[in-house]
Every structure is written in structure tokens, then in C-alpha cells.
Amino acid sequence: MSGMEVWSDPPRSCRMEQPATQQVATCSFPQNIKEENAYCLYDSEKCPKSAAATDLSTFPRLTSESCSNNDTTTSGGVPVPGYFRLSQAYPTSKQTLYSNTGQVGASPFVPQSQIRFGTPPSSASTPTELGRKGSEGTSPGHLTCSSEREEAEAAASSANEESSPVPSESNKNSPEKETKGEVKAENGANWLTAKSGRKKRCPYTKHQTLELEKEFLFNMYLTRERRLEISRSVHLTDRQVKIWFQNRRMKLKKMNRENRIRELTANFSFS
């Protein structure tokens, strides 16, 4: 126990004071100081009345803190019995500190309050007003004219596309076929053309038609065996040869009928 007594603090007769931070948190002000805090304003020497009015309306926390600090500095000469106050120990440093913070805090927030609570700027409303005026200024006649122009342009573009046909790949790759087609069109007396000048559809080549015409001269009606032989020699199917002979017989019958009518009409003279 003797060693512990050496290292431990000696017994003190007086009461130890609590640290300053705890005392400041638990300190209480008299009734007259609290009433002054409720009706506190900035001093006329530090800031003008207009700035004080705007700061009081917009920033109540700043004003309450600064007012309480000013009251403590001004009432530093009145000591409170039984309590330790920081204003008694450091009066000058606190005055300079809070006076600087009050000035710095008041200056940057004044333009913000003017911007927020003032009249809205005219530049923000100008584009909307211009858009409304432009929409109101456009008359229905102008809208109808623009719609008619667009329809006319669309119709003209579609007509140009239809009038200019896209050249097929076969025409691009084979110019010789074009010359052959032109030569055939020039021959008006060709047996492939009718009296009206319209070109008939002919799925047979010239060699095939010549072979079939030769066989038709010998025999108008073919047996099945002979039809198969001709189809092999001409590289056609049995059905194609059969259809060609049927059409050729109908054509011959029509030609005979026309010739008979022509002979009968030639004998009678109509006056």
C-alpha cells in the first residue's frame, strides 16, 4: 500500500473544478439574459439595418448564435457567482472571432436571398413567351399550305420513282440480248406477231418450232410413241409437245375459216 500511495495523487482538501467544456455545456443564464436573447438585434455600428433585417428573416440560426455571443461579450462585466465563464478569460479573442464570422457569413448569403426570393429573371421567361407567340402567330392557312406542299412533293417523288424503272441485271449483263430484241421488234411481218402487232408469248426456241412445224406438215395427229420420240429430239416434255400440236390445230382451223369467209365475200359485190 505504501507504493500505491507514492504514485497516487496526494489528498486535496479543496474541491476540484470541472473542465471548462463541461461547465459551458451545463451553464445556465439568469432570467434577464434569456429575455434579452429573444429580442436581440445586430449593433448599428457593425452592420446596417437593411442587412440585419434580411439576415434575420432568412437565417434565424445565424442570428440567434451571433446574438447570444454578442450578449455574452457585452455582459462580460457582470460576473455570475459560482460559475466559470470563458468570456472572462478570453474577452478580446471572442469579440474578434464572432465579429469576423458575422461579417463573412452575412456577405455571401445576401445575393442568394435576393436571387431566391426576388422577382424571377426575365431571361428565363423569354423563350417560353417567344414559343407561345410563334405558335399563336402561325395561321391555319399557313399550316394548310405547308401540308399541301409536302403532299405535292411526296407525289412528285413517287411519280419520278415509277417513271424511272430500275434496270434489271439481265439487261446490264447482256447487251447482245437488247440488240436481238430490237431486231425482232423491227420485223413486223414475223410469224410470232399477230395482226394487232402484239408479240405473242413463245416458250419455244426457233429450232424447236421448226422441228414441230415439220412434223405437223406430215401428220397433224401424233401417236404416243411418236410424241415421245419428238420430245426427246427437241428436248421438251411429252405434255409440251401435246399442247403445241393442239394449239397448232386450232390455229389452222381459224385460218381455214378466215380464208373461207374471204372467198365468199369476194364473190359478192356490195354497191
From Swiss-Prot:
How is this protein annotated for GO cellular component?
A: nucleus
Stretches of Low complexity bias are at 154-173
Q: Where is this region: Disordered?
A: 61-82, 109-199
- Where this protein primarily resides, as one coarse class? nucleus
Q: Name one GO molecular function term.
A: DNA-binding transcription factor activity, RNA polymerase II-specific
Quote the biased-composition stretches of kind Basic and acidic residues, using this chain's numbering: 174-185
Subcellular location(s) per record: Nucleus
Compositional bias segments (type: Polar residues) = 61-76, 109-128
InterPro entries to which the protein is assigned, alphabetical: HD, HD_metazoa, Homeobox_CS, Homeodomain-like_sf, HXA10/ABDB-like
Which residues fall under the DNA-binding region feature? 197-256
Q: Print the keywords alphabetically.
A: Developmental protein, DNA-binding, Homeobox, Nucleus, Transcription, Transcription regulation
Kindly give the SMART domains that the UniProt entry links to this protein: HOX (SM00389)
In terms of CDD domains, this protein maps to: homeodomain
Write down the Pfam families for this protein, in alphabetical order: Homeodomain
Q: Which family does it belong to?
A: Belongs to the Abd-B homeobox family.
Question: What is the role of the protein in this entry?
Answer: Sequence-specific transcription factor which is part of a developmental regulatory system that provides cells with specific positional identities on the anterior-posterior axis.
Q: What is this protein called?
A: Homeobox protein Hox-A10
Annotated source species: Heterodontus francisci (Horn shark)
What's the source species' lineage?
A: Eukaryota, Metazoa, Chordata, Craniata, Vertebrata
